[in-house]
Structures are given as C-alpha cells and as structure tokens.
Amino acid sequence: MADDKFTLPLRPLIEKRDRPDPLPLEIAQINAQWGSFRDVSEESLRAKIEEEKSKEYTIEEEEGEGAGAELDTTERLDQLYKRRAEIIQFAMQAHMEAMFALDFISLLLSKHTPRQAETSMSAYLKQVAPLGSLNSEIISPPPKSEAVVRDTKTVSRGWRLQNFNAAADKLLKSASRLENEVASETRYWHEVLAVKDKGWKLCRLPRQGQTLGVQYGFLEATPIFRDRGLAALRRSQDGALILDKGLVPMKAKTVRVRVKDHGIITGCSKPYRSAAQDPDSIEGRILQARDTLFEEELFHELFREARIMGSQGVTTRQNMVQFPVSEEQDILLDLVDPYQEAYVDDEETKSEEHNVLADALAHSIRILLCYAHRQNLRRRTQPPPALSPRRRHIPEYQLLRPIMAYLQHSFHVRWLETFMKDVYGVLQSAGLSCSFTATPYSSVNLSNSDRSVPKVEGLIRQFLLPLETTFSADLLTPQSSFKVKTRTNLSVPPFGTHFEILLNLPHYPDVHSPHRIGLHDQAATIITHFIMLDIVAAIESQTSPASSISKTEAKSVSWEATYPHHGELLSVSIDGKQKKMKVILSRDELTVQTYDVQGVERYSRATPETTPGLQTHTWKAGPTTAPGLMEYVAAVSQR
C-alpha cells in the first residue's frame, strides 16, 4: 500500500548539469583568477575575504539606496498583482488537468456503469462524446515457456517457505515471551498477595492509577510523614516484587536514649531493630521502612517539642536533644543508625548502671507517640470545629514533658523520702515515738478512669496529668501532724516541682506554711522548723505542773517556751535560779543545750558557749545507749 501513494512536490526541481566541470578546468580558473597556489597564504586569504565583504556591503548599500529611490508604492503593487496572477494561473492549470483526467476516467467507466459515470462528467464532455464511446480490453500476455513458469513457481514456493519460517520464528518468540511474562506476572501477584495476607494495606498510587502501592506509614501522623508512608510495588524483569525507593528511607534509623551522670555516660538504650526474620525480603524491607519512618517522626516531634521548652532547661543541637533531671543527671536523645559499631557511645562509657532507665525512657516516648496518633484519630472522627479565617495551630505532642515530669518528680520524691528518714531516724534515736508514711503518685487513680476509653489510653492519660505524692507525718504532741504534697507539672504554668506543707500544731495555731515552696533547702528548713516547734511544745507540756511527771517528781522545775521559734525554753526554780534550754534540730542531729541565766538575761539571746554551766547533749541517727530526750530533760529539770 505504501507504493500506491501519490506525492505532489511543491518545490521546483533543480536540474543537474549534464556535464559537470572537471577538476582540471576549475584549477585552471583559480590560477587565472588568483594566481599560483604558492603565493596564497592564510593572511592573504583573510585580507581578501575582508576586502570582498566590505565591497559587497558597499554595493548592497548603494543598490539598496538606488532601489529605494527608484521603486515607489505603485511599482510594488504592480509586482504583487503580477505574482498573484501567476499563482492563480498555476492553480487554474492544475484544476483543468485534474478535470481532464476525471472526464477521461468517467468516459471510460460509462461503458459499464453509465449512470454512475454520468454524474462525474463535465457538461462539455456530455455534448461532444456519447456515453460508452470509449472502452478498454484486457490483452492477453504473451505465452511463457515451461522453464520460466517452473522458475516462477520455484521462486514463489521459496518465498512462501521463507515467510512461513519467519512467521513460525515470530510465533515461537512470542510464545516464549508470553510464557516468561505469565511466569513473572504470576510471581509478582503471588508476592503481592503474600504482602496483603501479612496485613499490609494495598492501594493505588494517587497519580499513577495503574501502579499498586503499600501503605506502611501511619495515617494519623503529621502530613509530611503521612505522605511518605506510601511506596509503590513495582515488578522486576523476573517478576520479583520491588519496593520503590522514592520515599522509602534508605538506611535504618532509631532514637537512642542515653543517661549522663556527673558528666559520664552511665546508661544507653538497646538498639531497636526490625522484627523481620529475613531483612532482605519484601516484608523485611517494608518493616524496616515503617520502623525507620516512625523513628524519624518520633525524633522530629521530640525536636519540635524541645524548641518550646527552652525555659525549662531543654537544649537542642544539630542531632541531639538534652534535658536535665537534676543537677547531676542529664538525658540525651539522638537519631542514629542501629547497625553502626559505635552505637553504644562515641565516648568512653564508664558503667551500665542506668541501662534499665534508658530502655524505659525509650519505650515511653514511643508509647506516647502512639497515644498521640490515637488522639489524632479521635479528633478526626469527631465533628469538625466551626470555620475560621485563622489557621488552626497543630499543638506539639507531649513526649518530653511527661517523662521529664516523671523523672523530676521521682528525683524530688526520693530526696524528700531520704530527708524524712534522716530526720525521723534522729528523732527515734532520741527516744521520740513518731513516724511518717508516703503515698507515691497519689494523683494516679485508675478506678475513676473513663470506661469508654481503652485501659492503655486511660493509664497514659493519668500520667499526663500533674503528678502528686503525699507524705503524712506524726509529731510528738497529741493531734500534731503535717503533710507534704510534692506536685510536678510541666504542661501548664507554673512549671516544675513545688512542695506544699499542711501543718496541724494545736499549741501554735497561728503558724502556717508558705503556699508554694520550690527549693529543697527551703522545704527542709521549714519541715525541721515545724518539728523543732513540736519538740519545744512536747518539752513544755511534759514539764508543766499539770503533767503526771511533774506531779511525781516534785523537785523538778517546769520549762516555759520563751522563744519557741528559736527553740528556747526557760525554767525558774523556787530559789530564783534560772535556766535556759535551746533545742537545735537538723537533718543529721538533734542537740539540746542548757545553761544558767541571771536577771534580765532571761530575755536576752546570749551565746550559749560564753555562758556558765553549759550542758550539751546530741543525738544522731542510729542505735545508741544514751538516754532519750525526755529522760535528759527530766535530769536537767531537777532543782
């Protein structure tokens, strides 16, 4: 069919010369015009070329100026009309030739189909030539010899055999290619179904409707990580399933948690690796991509939250988040490769004392991120808020704040418990019967949690609230007690840990504690001061004339609290002798000093070391055979 096409050239044919000029003739012309080749150099040729260019430019300018002067508008219009007439003449000539050819064919066909042929004839042809006046006959070709006929049959048979062989080869190649294609497609779809049977979600790619993808990310993550959680499942040449490397993380990453104590790394979390049995399988690659994407989102959210916690001591560097737990201990979080050799630490690790703490923190931040995803899902399923021109702010996830609150709260609770044990150990060594009880995390109440919420979410929600621990302590005098509430809150102001002391001293009802205490030293000073006040009240009540001890021991004197807030008591005997007693209580010891005073010295604050008759007794924590405080008071109270 390609040979039957008719092409009409629109460009004029260029006639070739019948006799092209021979090379000797051209050389002779060059010698006659330019001289011998020996006299030709590059400089002379360049100069000649420049000279010719300048001449041509000058001639063109002169011709242009002359032509512009000679040709006017009328002549230009005449030329345009002439060109138009020539084009019309050529078109008319082509039309006439086409009509002549059509009349010829129509007259020829009028012999057999006159009605159809008459419709395409011109009016002039119908007048001058009757229908069917032109006919055509088939002339039989000259007879061929048997040898020619035999050769023709042989050649045609050879062509047919060759075409049959070529067709057979093409069919075999197509069959083998189809077989390979079926095998590769079968393997591809088997692996796709295996991925689906594992529980992975399969879907079409958004802008590639013919390509399948696997959703390994988390739909409730932030948009930048949610969009990266979809990868294409492509087919290799042999039909193996290939996970598209477009958005899949190339290397595995994990968040490492380290504990630094006194400037030394004392704990490091274990590297988190994928749970796939075969890391090179398609499932192993999907699991690695999911875990790495989760770890990258976790560190991104940690970094994002750390930026708003600079006032609480959280610092960020290029690839690290650091926050303090106490003055001696810090927590470091960074994103590293779990398979690198220097995973444990690039510095020298002195001990592994806090490895359990580091692992617990690593698990906690991952659980908190999953909880944040659950909250995003819960908000997404609720009715949307009213439309507003202001863009809604996406709050930072609570990842660092809960663990910081827990660690700081635990540190302050341990300090307070140690302090109370030391103080009450001193009191018990002095023979004073008193005790205290601690209720850690009294704010966590799982019994009142919302039953519509899963238990895990309810438990996490309890630890996101401000943490509170209560210490209840009994004192020496009846109905005297105090409570210390340790409250830690890092979500809303005021941030940090605060101590609140509730005091019940019947002997000093006007004494109250400050509302909020933020420092250890202040809390320790206030607690020891309250206990010292109760000791002074106990000594005063025991040696008062109404007490049973005073009645049995008539020769003993009574003590009166003159400056109770300074731990000072005064006793006056019948003969007018006066004594002072000073009670000093600290975390490590209880000291009682007695000395004689005269006259107006009873109201003075003299230094005990410079007074006569000074007696001192000290009790420290631990077992002792010395008399107790009340026995010592009874001994020094003898007249």
Swiss-Prot record:
The keyword Coiled coil applies. Belongs to the Mediator complex subunit 17 family. One of its GO terms (molecular function) is transcription coregulator activity. InterPro entries: Mediator_Med17. Component of the Mediator complex, a coactivator involved in the regulated transcription of nearly all RNA polymerase II-dependent genes. Mediator functions as a bridge to convey information from gene-specific regulatory proteins to the basal RNA polymerase II transcription machinery. Mediator is recruited to promoters by direct interactions with regulatory proteins and serves as a scaffold for the assembly of a functional preinitiation complex with RNA polymerase II and the general transcription factors. It comes from the Eukaryota. The gene is srb4. Component of the Mediator complex. This is Mediator of RNA polymerase II transcription subunit 17. It is found in: Nucleus. GO terms for cellular component: core mediator complex; mediator complex. Residues 160-187 form a coiled coil. The keyword Kinase does not apply. One of its GO terms (biological process) is regulation of transcription by RNA polymerase II. Keywords: Activator, Coiled coil, Nucleus, Transcription, Transcription regulation.
